[in-house]
Each structure stands twice: as C-alpha cells, then as structure tokens.
Amino acid sequence: MSDINVEVVYALPDRQYLRTVKLAQGSTVEQAIVASGLLTLRNDIDLQKNKLGVYSRPVKLTDILEEGDRVEIYRPLLADPKEMRRKRAERAKNNAQ
C-alpha cells in the first residue's frame, strides 16, 4: 500500500491551523486528525461534539480518506441560524410599522 497526503484544517476568527499529514492508504478521518497533532494543540476540539467535513461535505470519524483530501474541523455555532433569522424578521417588521 502506498501513502496518501491529506490536510487537516481548523479555523478560529483570529488564527487558522493547517497541517499536512502523510498516512497509509485506507486511513480514517480520525487517524488524520490525531496524526495532525491538533488535538494536543487545541483543547477546545472535541471529536464527539465538533462536526467534521471533507471539502465541506459532512463526514464521520470512520470515513476513509483519499489522496489530497482536506479534513475540516468545524467550530460549534454560537447562535442558532433559525432563531437569528426569526429575530431579524421580527425587528424588520417592527421597524416597518
């Protein structure tokens, strides 16, 4: 089996982390994240809570990676998008009166 190269990314408002890791073919999303070292560098990453993706496509920890994939670790939302839209619509309605 040959090795594959994948990127693991985690972005904060003021800093971005990008790690390129070499893994055995057939490696999982979880193995890539562990190999990147981001779990020890950032204690705010919780693989049971943070959502994950590969090029914006949702994935699970057990999904197999391919050469050139970019594993993205997403931060939790600070506000519920539906609730924010509802509040904006309510404000717009009140301002229009």
UniProtKB/Swiss-Prot annotation:
InterPro entries: Mopterin_synth/thiamin_S_b, RnfH, RnfH_sf. Pfam families: Ub-RnfH. SUPFAM superfamilies: MoaD/ThiS (SSF54285). Gene3D superfamilies: RnfH-like. It comes from the Bacteria. Belongs to the UPF0125 (RnfH) family. HAMAP family: UPF0125_RnfH (MF_00460). PANTHER family: UPF0125 PROTEIN RATB (PTHR37483:SF1). This is UPF0125 protein plu3376.
